């Protein structure tokens, strides 16, 4: 579900970062909830501190809830109404002026659940003047909006996938595609939502990816125009995220070769783990230990690297050949 065209929530009286009427009006616009990978961080320490604070706030929020079903999640925001309605391409919105959270009724239940937690994240953020002030001091404009959306995704992950649950998945399955699939199942969220939460907590160099059958990439479709229309579906990357120390991800839409472990896992319905490679879109390959786990029509994949190899021959070659696959 990876950058959202959104606007930040704008309470009045924010220390060091007050907003005018125009910004306040922007805050109530509906917006999609898409996990955001930030391309450039001008103040990494500020963002890291803000994420840590947001996790603490979300953990405190969850601790006071009677449960984690939809009704229980709303218990921490008394006075705020929850409404489900068709929202087109938008996933949801939080309108602080009218105290209402809107959720797209046409979205899948897993998507609705993450969206609700994300919108609750907006409410949590609005309730902490110090954190709001800090991020307004450090960022502005579109970058501020991106940071706010990122913090709300951090909150959503902390609400639905708390650190002890992620730690349990990593302990049981290691940093693998199966850990990703099991986390999504346990938290009742999509694998794309679980992707970013797992990435944040994985201590070793890994690229995680969610792959699913879909239409052939545009490049391939264009080359096959003379052959006429095709109904064949190709396994492609839907979302990807990398842990600290790994500078690349797989771009959305990257095709997965038919002989790759991920394609084999989809074809057989069985987990496949073997020494293989990262299939960059250009055709270049980077060695990695691959674990591909099929689940509910998708394949959750991990590409684990030998730390000693990072920054050496393979990654230097990727650096020259794969700028389009750099982490977004």
Curated annotation (Swiss-Prot):
Catalytic residues identified in the record: 119
Record's keyword terms, sorted: DNA-binding, Hydrolase, Metal-binding, Metalloprotease, Protease, Stress response, Zinc
Listed Pfam families: Peptidase_M78
UniProt xrefs under InterPro entries: G3DSA:1.10.10.1030, IrrE_HExxH, Rad_response_metalloprotease
Keyword Metal-binding in record: yes
Protein task: Plays a central regulatory role in DNA repair and protection pathways in response to radiation stress. Acts as a site-specific metalloprotease that cleaves and inactivates the repressor protein DdrO, resulting in induced expression of genes required for DNA repair and cell survival after exposure to radiation. Regulates the expression of dozens of proteins from different pathways, including the important DNA repair proteins RecA and PprA. Binds to the promoters of recA and pprA.
Record text about domains: Composed of three structural domains: an N-terminal zinc-peptidase domain, a central helix-turn-helix motif, and a C-terminal GAF-type domain.
Protein name: Radiation response metalloprotease IrrE
The organism of origin for this protein: Deinococcus radiodurans (strain ATCC 13939 / DSM 20539 / JCM 16871 / CCUG 27074 / LMG 4051 / NBRC 15346 / NCIMB 9279 / VKM B-1422 / R1)
Gene name per UniProt: irrE
